[in-house]
Swiss-Prot record:
Molecular-function GO terms, alphabetical: acetyl-CoA carboxylase activity; ATP binding; carboxyl- or carbamoyltransferase activity
Species of the source: Caulobacter sp. (strain K31)
Ranges where the CoA carboxyltransferase C-terminal domain occurs: 33-294
Pathway: Lipid metabolism; malonyl-CoA biosynthesis; malonyl-CoA from acetyl-CoA: step 1/1
PANTHER family according to UniProt: ACETYL-COENZYME A CARBOXYLASE CARBOXYL TRANSFERASE SUBUNIT ALPHA (PTHR42853), ACETYL-COENZYME A CARBOXYLASE CARBOXYL TRANSFERASE SUBUNIT ALPHA, CHLOROPLASTIC (PTHR42853:SF3)
Family: Belongs to the AccA family.
Keywords: ATP-binding, Cytoplasm, Fatty acid biosynthesis, Fatty acid metabolism, Lipid biosynthesis, Lipid metabolism, Nucleotide-binding, Transferase
Gene field: accA
Superkingdom of source: Bacteria
HAMAP family per UniProt: AcetylCoA_CT_alpha
Stated name of the protein: Acetyl-coenzyme A carboxylase carboxyl transferase subunit alpha
Length: 320
């Protein structure tokens, strides 16, 4: 069973607890005992999971996007990138582990890969600052994109952040400028770039790694200019109304594809990416490979033109 269940998953959790209890009884009762009962319960749990995830509202999707067991950047690197060599530091101030990146081979193709890393436990979450990057993280991203262009390598990014770190030190070191430079660098990159929103895509801290030719999004991920809690605090002076804000912000993958802010939705396993991380990772890999193959046929000038047209069209199309 999963270690963490969301509120709407409680009936599934109860059923899986019964499955576990029955499985333990079958071990003492002998081979084949309760086999049909266990299988029937598993089938029922799977059906409940499909039904629950088919009808998620925007706030529930936000909770799924933030699920602590959802695969993060390092999981995608481990599952998709061979011969990965991490590159550290911005060559100006420090190395920010909220953004991890380097060189590797994606299904045989040399690439530059980078993204936000949130961490999976207390130690790694603190190390990676919960995926909230400081200026040096975005300057590291610019450095990696510069390298990609110099050596004519495609860029693959994974976006998963609540937003850039808002601390005093980050602001003193030029957080806004660093985000702007990273966004700009992606928009004028002369090599193919594919970004995937794999969890949260929050504010400028997310778009700084998503100035890509193609922006993909996992089925239950979100992408927005501000968190639902932040929007509720501004609109109603009450962060507790985050659910109301989420319902009106058009932050889900399904909203975003209709608005033409993202280009493709990657389906998740029944029960979300956290229910079967390996399958989710391979689904993302298949989608990225598909997009990358088409983009690699374009010249640098064509890539820049396509990317510019894509972003200029946002706000003009899909709003009818």
């Amino acid at each position: 069973m999963a270690a963490h269940y969301l509120d709407f998953e409680r009936p599934i959790a109860d059923l899986e607890s019964k499955i576990e209890e029955l499985s333990k009884l079958s071990e003492t009762a002998g081979p084949g005992a309760f086999e049909s009962e266990i299988q029937a319960l598993r089938d029922r749990a799977q059906q409940m999971r499909k039904e629950a995830y088919a009808g998620l509202d925007a706030w529930q999707k936000t909770m799924v996007a933030r699920h602590p067991e959802r695969p993060h950047l390092k999981d995608y690197i481990a599952g998709l990138i061979d011969e990965f060599v991490e590159l550290r530091g911005d060559r100006k101030f420090a190395d920010d582990q909220a953004i991890v990146g380097g060189l590797g081979r994606f299904r045989g193709v040399p690439v530059v890969v980078m993204g936000h890393e949130k961490g999976h436990d207390t130690t790694t979450r603190l190390k990676h600052n919960f995926g909230m990057a400081r200026p040096e993280g975005y300057r590291k991203a610019v450095r990696l994109m510069d390298m990609a262009e110099r050596f004519n390598l495609p860029v693959i990014t994974f976006v998963d952040t609540a937003g850039a770190y808002p601390g005093l030190g980050a602001e003193e070191r030029g957080q806004a400028e660093a985000i702007a430079r990273s966004t700009e660098r992606g928009l004028v990159l002369g090599t193919p770039m594919v970004a995937t929103i794999v969890g949260e895509g929050g504010s400028g801290g997310a778009i700084a790694l998503a100035g890509a030719n193609k922006v993909l999004i996992l089925e239950h991920s979100i992408y927005s200019v501000i968190s639902p809690e932040g929007a509720a605090s501004i609109l109603w002076r009450d962060g507790a109304r985050a659910k109301d804000a989420a319902a009106n912000m058009k932050i889900t993958a399904q909203d975003l594809i209709q608005l033409k802010i993202v280009d493709r939705i990657v389906e998740e396993p029944a029960g979300g990416a956290h229910s079967d991380p390996d399958a989710a990772i391979q689904s993302v890999g298949d989608a990225v490979e598909d997009e990358l193959k088409a983009l690699m046929k374009l010249s640098a000038a064509e890539l820049k033109k396509q990317r510019a047209a894509r972003f200029y069209a946002i706000g003009r199309e899909g709003l009818q």
